[in-house]
């Protein structure tokens, strides 16, 4: 069993254990599609085994393949697309983001690496070894000054600094930021999704196994728990912050939690849990206009070369 497959199995088992803890929720679940001129579901290549998604302002979307590192690029308005980055040995694609310079940053899972591609051509631009030991590089967010990567097995974030005009750094400039403060490492899958707030001055992370949310000071690594009034987002995977509204995908729960954050990010309230009959272990989330798009990773379905995979659109208003 390959390291990446072992990690995914661990993730699935960990999430299943957490199902009971998250079954009782105060906020009601709802299901809704909108904008009938946009596809409700987008078909990905059979056998693709997707995980992460990124969408640009023009509706171009990117979805990565866990076991091969391939990236599928398409248009959310038509639902059509093609493979932009071919898979290759020694690569993986978990979370991904596109920056303002048209570059695709990809978290490399159990490879311990980060990969950067030209988003338009798919041409490799750089790769970075983030971790030397056992790790799982799970998600990424790109600010004006750095790309930040999470590690689900270690209490650390990795910083890939960007130059004044967005220039990519050398390997020796990549640093690790130890997490301190309220965050405590637990057994299983820890830090997963990440986003930034306040123009990159604060980072927000979710801890999958505990369902807790934290802010992170990117200068010091100090974490502060976001008080949800006793609620949690167990099985939290990808996250998306729009203004003061935070969306958290709860993968094996087949839910997306919508959380209204206080202006200082110290507390928030779960206002609803979005469900959809088309959800099948959704993992990550991105938006286009008022629409949310989630990737069905289907972790509970044994993957085969003919297993179908989809991206599902739901109302994000």
Placement of each model-derived feature along the sequence:
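Conserved beta-strand positions in repeat-built beta-propeller and related beta-rich domains
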Residues: 61-68, 98-99, 104-111, 148-153, ...
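Blade-level signature of beta-propeller repeat domains, shared across WD40, Kelch, NHL, RCC1
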Residues: 284-317
């Amino acid at each position: 069993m390959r390291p990446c497959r072992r990690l995914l199995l661990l993730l699935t088992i960990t999430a299943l254990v957490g199902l009971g803890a998250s079954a009782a929720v105060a906020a009601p679940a709802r299901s809704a599609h909108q904008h009938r001129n946009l596809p409700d579901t987008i078909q990905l290549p059979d056998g693709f085994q997707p995980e992460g998604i990124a969408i640009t302002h023009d509706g171009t979307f990117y979805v990565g393949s866990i076991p091969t590192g391939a990236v599928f690029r398409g248009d959310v308005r038509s639902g059509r697309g093609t493979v932009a980055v071919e898979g290759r040995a020694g690569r993986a694609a978990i979370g991904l983001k596109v920056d303002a310079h048209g570059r695709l940053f990809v978290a490399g899972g159990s490879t311990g690496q980060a990969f950067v591609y030209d988003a338009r051509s798919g041409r490799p631009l750089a790769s970075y070894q983030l971790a030397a030991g056992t790790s799982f590089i799970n998600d990424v967010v790109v600010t004006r000054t750095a790309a930040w990567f999470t590690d689900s097995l270690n209490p650390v974030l990795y910083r890939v600094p960007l130059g004044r005009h967005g220039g990519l750094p050398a390997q020796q400039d990549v640093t690790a930021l130890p997490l301190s403060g309220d965050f405590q490492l637990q057994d299983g899958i820890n830090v997963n999704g990440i986003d930034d707030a306040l123009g990159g001055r604060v980072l927000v992370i979710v801890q999958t196994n505990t369902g807790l949310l934290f802010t992170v000071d990117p200068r010091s690594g100090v974490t502060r728990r976001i008080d949800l009034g006793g609620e949690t987002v167990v099985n939290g995977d990808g996250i998306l912050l729009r203004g003061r509204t935070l969306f958290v995908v709860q993968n094996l729960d087949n839910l997306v939690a919508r959380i209204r954050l206080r202006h200082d990010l110290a507390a928030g309230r779960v206002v609803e849990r979005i469900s959809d009959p088309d959800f099948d272990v959704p993992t990550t989330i991105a938006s286009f206009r008022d629409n949310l798009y989630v990737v069905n990773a289907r972790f509970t379905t044994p993957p085969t070369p003919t297993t179908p995979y989809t991206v599902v659109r739901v109302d994000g208003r």
